[in-house]
From Swiss-Prot:
Residue intervals of the 4Fe-4S domain: 32-91
UniProt-annotated binding residues for [4Fe-4S] cluster 2: 117, 120, 123, 157
NCBIfam families in the cross-refs: PRK05113.1 (NF003475), rnfB (TIGR01944)
Gene3D superfamilies, A to Z: 3.30.70.20, Electron transport complex subunit B, putative Fe-S cluster
Cofactor: how bound: Binds 3 [4Fe-4S] clusters.
Pfam families named in the record: Fer4_21, FeS
Protein's name according to its UniProt entry: Ion-translocating oxidoreductase complex subunit B
Functional description taken from the UniProt entry: Part of a membrane-bound complex that couples electron transfer with translocation of ions across the membrane.
UniProt cross-references to SUPFAM superfamilies, sorted A to Z: 4Fe-4S ferredoxins
InterPro entries found in the cross-reference section: 4Fe-4S_dom, 4Fe4S_Fe-S-bd, 4Fe4S_Fe_S_CS, Elect_transpt_cplx_RnfB/RsxB, RnfB/RsxB_Proteobac, RnfB_subfamily
Domain 4Fe-4S ferredoxin-type: 108-137, 138-167
Annotated keywords: 4Fe-4S, Cell inner membrane, Cell membrane, Electron transport, Iron, Iron-sulfur, Membrane, Metal-binding, Repeat, Translocase, Transport
Amino acid sequence: MSTIWIAIAALSALALAFGLVLGYASRRFEVENDPIVEEVEAMLPQSQCGQCGYPGCRPYAEAVALNGENINKCGPGGEAMMLKLAEKLNVDPQPLEGDADVQAPARQVAWIDESNCIGCTKCIQACPVDAIIGSTKAVHTVVSDLCTGCDLCVAPCPTDCIELRPIAPTPANWKWDLDTIPVRVIQVERHA
């Protein structure tokens, strides 16, 4: 019985010693991160889709914060996220595609033709934001509120039953073209 207690005490002392050494090493060799990079990364949608030309949201955040990369390359974040980045970094807002003459594309979401879906789950595995629900050998469907339109689920589908479709306009996502609305000032005559 005493050998068990000796073994427990020895392992506990060893664990304590390793814990102290690792704790000291983590404090001593800590790498300082740029807080601006952390804030920019927190603002990005974290879909890791690669539409910006970088392998994920962290490298894009580093390029924006440290190298002055354009803030208009994140497709899933859209115009709202670009405006937040512009305000945070004190830069001028940029058109989403980088060209003022090009109209920003309508937001699209994945759509699954459920009559052709074989339930292989390849699209579920490819989706970085878990916007596709379903199980093996069952029909899958897309939760359009979660879908970022990154297009990563389309290629793995063996039956080509997934396509991107534009979102139908609703009062929540409608963009008013304020330039075409005529504004007239009507003079009011006051009678005494």
